[in-house]
């Protein structure tokens, strides 16, 4: 008598048999099948062909080995937009939406504001600001050519074509290096690498698969922030603002750097987990 258990043949059976977190399994199965999440419910008992099952099982194995969902699906939602993601860019996190909200607050009421995003990566911050403020002139700087390619692709996909090639400008640059010295911005924002070189988190979870240069400054976690703060006076307009994302335990240190650099109204803002996640200040003038 054949007692071999049959392989899962439907979406419902694959999900029940999956060793993954239920949400991860649903996301990957929908991606493998090209279905919406609603279709996973309405077509749950529909037989799947061998190729479809194989696609899902390959993704399941990679996720079980730790690969990030965003890299497996090639996408991540951020600020209501779906960004293309590759292993060349940092995966946008929900807490970084605070930086976008803060930048939008800083330019509220300013006509055609100038915005600078340093270390744009996937373009999540710059594209989100440009989407919310079509009148804004946004510069997005990034030293990684591969990351810039992803950012440009996201701009083309998510913004009006006129914006993707015009008021949103991408430059290959190591922080401020490629900027015209005469430029001034109403707000400068950055989510720089702020994890210290020896932080054990770099060897854990999704971070193992993301570009190391977007995560750590290969120093104490504040080196990139020091560079950005030190150069800000040359590019922040009088009365303009500088805002930086940082680690959960770095707010006080970043405020000290901003105070020492002569910024006024220095403060930190907490994310939805009540963690001080962004700090900034205003340049007097």
Swiss-Prot record:
Transmembrane segments: none annotated. Substrate binds at residues 191-194. SUPFAM superfamilies: S-adenosyl-L-methionine-dependent methyltransferases (SSF53335). Keywords: Methyltransferase, S-adenosyl-L-methionine, Transferase. It comes from the Bacteria. InterPro entries: DNA_methylase_N6_adenine_CS, HemK-like, N5-glutamine_MTase, PrmC_N, RF_methyltr_PrmC, SAM-dependent_MTases_sf, Small_mtfrase_dom. S-adenosyl-L-methionine binds at residues 119-123, 142, 175, 191. Its EC number is 2.1.1.297. It catalyses: L-glutaminyl-[peptide chain release factor] + S-adenosyl-L-methionine = N(5)-methyl-L-glutaminyl-[peptide chain release factor] + S-adenosyl-L-homocysteine + H(+). GO terms for biological process: methylation. GO terms for molecular function: nucleic acid binding; protein-(glutamine-N5) methyltransferase activity; protein-glutamine N-methyltransferase activity. The keyword Methyltransferase applies. HAMAP family: RF_methyltr_PrmC. Methylates the class 1 translation termination release factors RF1/PrfA and RF2/PrfB on the glutamine residue of the universally conserved GGQ motif. Belongs to the protein N5-glutamine methyltransferase family. PrmC subfamily. This is Release factor glutamine methyltransferase. It comes from Burkholderia pseudomallei (strain K96243).
